[in-house]
Amino acid sequence: TDPNHAFGDSRWPWKADYLGALRGWTRAMQGRVVIYDYDQSMLVWRDLPNPSHQVLQAEIKEHARLGILGFGTESRNALATTFLHLYFRGQLYWNPQLDVQAELKQFYPRFFGPAAAPMEAYWSAIYRAWDETIVTEHEFFVIPAIYPREMVERLGSWLRQTDAVQQ
């Protein structure tokens, strides 16, 4: 399936097919369904930010309504790729109502200190790029479509601001 968009996203009607199949399986199995979750960080390219918690945040409430028993997530410890989204995935599995944006607002100043503002801009731009992408594939050749040169230059400027704050 398309790992970049939630199954409620009207731009991608085939995601409704996936949701229909999931509903069918939970009915047939009387709710005894566990999802093998191939975390998106396994895709695109190692050490390229590739967040996926936004998709899970949009889908997890439906998983809870369907009575999904749990998840088995396959991922890796490539922190530039997985950074916060594995933490948020774990939190969302336990609490589908988690307010990720509120958590992020607390995270940036706690983790980055005086560099919080440029790092919030940096990560927000990355999250927005994945939210807004029309890319449905998930291999290395999509990198320029998600991270065009202009965006990479903007990301670089926020990293330089972060570096300046820490000097």
Where are these regions (language model features)?
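Catalytic-core regions of glycoside hydrolase
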Residues: T1-K105, R110, R149-G156, R160, ...
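Charged, amphipathic alpha-helical linkers/stalks
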Residues: N95-H138
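Glycine-rich phosphate/pyrophosphate-binding loop
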Residues: E132-W158
